[in-house]
Amino acid sequence: GSYTYVANQTAADALDAGGSVTDSFNYTISDGSATDIGTITITVLGINDAPVAQDDVGVIAEGSTLTVANSANATLTGDSYDATGENSGDVIDTSSSSHTDSDADASSSLSITHVKLSGGSNSTVASSSSYNSNGTSITGTYGTLTIGADGSYTYAATTDATDALDAGESATDT
């Protein structure tokens, strides 16, 4: 005979690397006149799964109120937006702010948009680069991105650069 075993992927993904869980079940065989019972035991081993990047989005607008659209996955402390899991939200603050991704197993691109509040152009300035998580700082046009050695990152807007934007104009550091 044969059998097929389909692991509960959610339970298997929750295992730490090197961890294990055992599942077993009984089966009965028969030759038409006699039967016997056997047990199949399956051990699922945890591995270090490759990270899956989830985009985090933070928007800082000058002269407004601090809000977060997806508060179920975020914690606000002062002028910081700490993200865990997949996030898409707005951080709107009247002073300098930072955005921290605390998931050390994932890496993703970071896009920050600065906006002045009223009237004017809606043009966007964008650039794109890739950076390693080695504890370095990268200075963009409108702020500084610091990538921690543990994979965390913080973006701090530069007030002088964002003050140069016209009212209603936005710019993106990517």
Language model regions located:
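Acidic/polar, solvent-exposed loop/turn segments
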Residues: G1-T174
